[in-house]
Amino acid sequence: MSNYLINIIGPTAIGKTSLSIKVARHFITEIISADSRQFFKEMKIGTAVPDKDELAAATHHFIQHISIADAYSVGDFEKDAILKLKELFNKHKVAVMVGGSGLYIKAITEGLDDFPKVDPEIRRNLNQHLEEDGIDWLQKKLYVLDPEYYKTADVMNPHRLIRALEICIETGKPFSSFLNQKKPERNFKNITIGLMADREMIYDRINKRVDLMIRNGLIEEARELYPQKELNALNTVGYKELFSFFDGKTDLETAISEIKKNTRRFAKRQLTWFRKDPEIKWFEFDENSKNIFDYIESKINT
């Protein structure tokens, strides 16, 4: 009998958390969170961590389980999540995974690509360029060395940019050429549900979510984390814009506007990534849950 991993994906603020809980409750199973920023204990409001009622409605894994000071890569997540899934599949026929990061979803559904080791000096040089020349320098460099990967990369994330660039520089080959190599086999089948809406609706939901975060205390949360702003985990939309405000580089109104703008850009990149996957079954964000359950059951019973 096959095991099934039900993946709930889509752009930020589309309603993935709510649907994942409904699916988990319907199939009496548990949820793997693949949202890399919700891993961190100290980042709650700005990452839209499920609230107490949502966490109580279904068992979640990989929510606020590490500190922002911890080194935790997508490779670490792959190993930990696969072990957790083995445990879950001993109890359940299906499990649910939810998230908006295509890379973290792919790490579990397909496995990570095998990248060569990189000379640490290359990474140091790239970090120095980031410090002295800013993220724009990294973006332009990646566009030149690997325009194909640039199309879908999270170009506002310097950690991801540096990772791609160091592979390009070390090997002389595009980072994208190492993607989609033969992966380890998985002992489960994937059923992937994508939530979508028109652009205006997505942007409206994002703007309202940011306003809610501000009302719920995001500014205070960011202020507490400000002394640690150099940590990679905090180079995240919702925090870095407020850090600029605390630094006196901008006013609060502009910072909040930048959070909304950068979140909208992030949603656009998420959709660009996911739309390449023909295996995703797309539903409108307000689709009747029963129709989604029926689709999942039809795939399981095929």
UniProtKB/Swiss-Prot annotation:
Its EC number is 2.5.1.75. One of its GO terms (molecular function) is ATP binding. SUPFAM superfamilies: P-loop containing nucleoside triphosphate hydrolases. Its cofactor is Mg(2+). ATP binds at residues 10-17. It comes from the Bacteria. Keywords: ATP-binding, Magnesium, Nucleotide-binding, Transferase, tRNA processing. Disulfide bonds: none annotated. GO terms for biological process: tRNA modification. It catalyses: adenosine(37) in tRNA + dimethylallyl diphosphate = N(6)-dimethylallyladenosine(37) in tRNA + diphosphate. Substrate binds at residues 12-17. Residues 35-38 are annotated as: Interaction with substrate tRNA. The keyword tRNA processing applies. The record marks 101, 123 as: Interaction with substrate tRNA. Belongs to the IPP transferase family. Monomer. Catalyzes the transfer of a dimethylallyl group onto the adenine at position 37 in tRNAs that read codons beginning with uridine, leading to the formation of N6-(dimethylallyl)adenosine (i(6)A). PANTHER family: TRNA DIMETHYLALLYLTRANSFERASE (PTHR11088:SF60). This is tRNA dimethylallyltransferase. It comes from Christiangramia forsetii (strain DSM 17595 / CGMCC 1.15422 / KT0803). The lineage of its organism: Bacteria, Pseudomonadati, Bacteroidota, Flavobacteriia, Flavobacteriales.
